[in-house]
From Swiss-Prot:
Family of this protein: Belongs to the bacilliredoxin family.
PANTHER family: BACILLIREDOXIN BRXB, UPF0403 PROTEIN YQIW-RELATED
Disulphide bonds in the chain: none
Organism: Staphylococcus aureus (strain MRSA252)
Name used for this protein in its record: Bacilliredoxin SAR1592
Gene3D superfamilies hit by this protein: Glutaredoxin
One BP term from GO: cell redox homeostasis
Highest taxon of the lineage: Bacteria
Alphabetical list of InterPro entries matching this protein: BrxB/BrxA
Length: 145
């Protein structure tokens, strides 16, 4: 690969990581990290991050803005598809019944998947639509803070 392309992609990945982390999501980079968090009681929103356009233009902004709400999950975490492969694979093992999809969101409660917002529910939609989908999940499975 061209060195300039590699440098460019490293910058894109770093920006995507920083954007979701600054919104309050914890980066999970190993299978052990994933198990430690997802096996806990309570609710966890998992954002499956990626470098595609709909992740940057829709999913990450929605992940951030959806948190301006009274009903929220207990924990916010992220795995990065294509980057943190071990962590992403382990997270997907919890998402039984759902095909691998990125970007996407999974709401896990007491170690079990409740529902997912998959790529096809993000791509081609606007940020507000995805925020509404997330907040609907929060209302259904989470408690007011």
């Amino acid at each position: 690969m061209d060195m300039n392309f590699d440098l460019y992609m490293n910058g894109v990945v770093e920006q995507a990581r920083n954007e979701i982390e600054s919104a309050g999501y914890e980066q999970l980079t190993t299978a052990e990290d994933v198990d430690k968090v997802l096996k806990q009681d309570g609710t966890t929103l998992v954002m499956i991050n990626s470098v595609c356009g709909c992740a940057g233009g829709i999913a990450r902004p929605a992940a951030s803005h959806a948190l301006h709400y009274d009903v929220l999950p207990d924990r916010l975490v992220t795995v990065f598809a294509g980057q943190d492969k071990e962590a992403t694979q382990r997270a997907r093992e919890y998402f039984e019944g759902y095909a691998p999809s990125s970007p996407s969101f999974a709401l896990v409660k007491d170690g079990n998947i409740t529902e997912m917002i998959e790529r096809h529910q993000i791509e081609g939609h606007d940020v507000m639509n995805v925020i509404n989908q997330l907040q609907t999940l929060f209302n259904k499975y989470c408690e007011e803070r």
